[in-house]
UniProtKB/Swiss-Prot annotation:
Taxonomic lineage: Bacteria, Bacillati, Bacillota, Clostridia, Eubacteriales
Pathway the protein takes part in: Cofactor biosynthesis; pyridoxal 5'-phosphate biosynthesis
Gene3D superfamilies linked to this entry: 3.40.50.880
Protein name: Pyridoxal 5'-phosphate synthase subunit PdxT
Family listed: Belongs to the glutaminase PdxT/SNO family.
Protein purpose: Catalyzes the hydrolysis of glutamine to glutamate and ammonia as part of the biosynthesis of pyridoxal 5'-phosphate. The resulting ammonia molecule is channeled to the active site of PdxS.
GO biological process: glutamine catabolic process; pyridoxal phosphate biosynthetic process; pyridoxine metabolic process
Length: 199
């Protein structure tokens, strides 16, 4: 199995380490040629979403990656990656891939709670460690979006077809369960193409 990891900015190395520990080949996606390579899954890491979005377009990566996501490529998106997937941003007119029918608020916890750690229920996995760093949260979800996790009533994890979007960083705590769940969704072989309007 080969998974592409967006590697233009942000916390991609930590994702790669977990995937490699799980026996998965990683392909760092750094340019348009990389973005057109065949991969069985995609990770959009945390970082700075505005910078990532700008680089995706400048490096000719945006359209090929969006086409793959729309066609049903499994995606795990964390923090800034969630912002890239969101159809709508509550406090920003920008849109990026816009394939995940959720409304996301950037830097939702403000400065005082900009970074924090907790352990909360995540789907069927039980309690998992969650590290939030200037994190967004999901204000609302569209039809058929499964809510996987909440913290203090705020939605911080969702699944829609082949897309998993998280407000937090599962790669920072040494817990592999969320990545394993993502890989299981790939090996399950189900593909759910999106019916999303073009950006």
């Amino acid at each position: 199995m080969r998974v592409g990891v967006l590697a233009v900015q942000g916390a991609f190395i930590e994702h790669e380490k977990i995937l490699q520990n799980l026996g998965v080949e990683c392909l760092e996606l750094r340019n348009g040629k990389d973005a057109r390579q065949d991969v069985e899954g995609l990770i959009l890491p945390g970082g700075e979403s505005t910078t990532q979005g700008k680089l995706l377009r400048e490096l000719d990566m945006f359209e090929p990656l969006r086409e793959k996501i729309v066609a049903g490529l499994p995606v795990l998106a964390t923090c800034a990656g969630l912002i890239l997937l969101a159809e709508e941003l509550a406090n920003d007119s920008a849109r990026y891939f816009a394939t995940l029918p959720v409304r996301v608020k950037r830097n939702a916890y403000g400065r005082q709670l900009g970074s924090f750690y907790t352990e909360e229920q995540f789907g069927d996995l039980g309690k998992v460690p969650m590290t939030f760093i200037r994190a967004p949260y999901i204000e609302s979800v569209g039809e058929d979006v499964e809510i996987l996790a909440k913290v203090n009533g705020d939605i911080v994890g969702v699944r829609y077809k082949n897309q998993i979007g998280l407000s937090f960083h599962p790669e920072l705590n040494g817990d592999r369960r969320i990545h394993q769940m993502f890989l299981d969704s790939i090996s399950g072989g189900k593909s759910f193409p999106c019916t999303q309007k073009a950006v």
